[in-house]
Amino acid sequence: MFRPLLALLLAATVGHANYADDAYAATFKLYNSALSGTCSLYRRPAPDTAVYLVTTQHQLEGSKGDYSQLVLREPQPDGSYKRNDFKVVTRINGKPTWVKHPKFDLAVLRLATPPTGTFATLPTSAIANDERLKAAQPSVGSSLLLFTFPHGVESIRQGFPVARQAVFAQPPLLSSETYPTFQADFPATAGDSGGPGVIADPNGKPLIVGMCFQRLNHDEKVTTEMTTTTVKHPLNMGTFIHGRYLLEAIELAAKQ
């Protein structure tokens, strides 16, 4: 039986509500004049005090200039939120400050000096490696949530992401070494790149199973007497990089 997304977010147990809330709170908009995308923030165990911004390589590479804005959300005493655009250095003298994963469309920016103000992060232990993913037992057709800014749209103007519902379109427990990406069924669109996919772990806490990096199309070549063109048919699916590779990229950035 279909249940509205709100019912999923406010599911029967407190644990299930918290897993979505915690991952949602650690998802942020990243933008500049040529960029409007999604990122999430993580922390490694102490003594590392840096914050790690995780997003796609293509978004950072396509950005212009040396700075981007990270849209933080400052809680106010009256229960409202204030938008706080924090300037992030993405290049120094034209050289990227982020670390790219050697194999995938995945980038991590190490913020040695964390942003000012109040903001949420997730511990890297919330990212699924193979062991954590197996313990959670997701299956083909089971649900996951995705938090993004589709076409740059904010659910609330102070920088809140949009919660989207998806299902695993292929078995998620296949070897992530052999199959480093997986597909999920949802109406993927521009701005979803960089969004974390999340399920509940066995303790009801957030488990980041991967990061969305592209929407899936079927390309059809159409040839006429005069021209040949490619028609892209949207398949309403997105492709995710498995969580273990997010962990790899964060560790690479930590060694900078």
Residue ranges of each PLM-predicted region?
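Sec-dependent N-terminal signal peptides
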Residues: 4-13
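Gly/Ser-enriched beta-turn/beta-hairpin loop segments
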Residues: 114-118, 156-162, 171-180
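Catalytic nucleophile loop of clan PA
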Residues: 185-212
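C-terminal cap/linker of serine protease catalytic domains
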Residues: 207-256
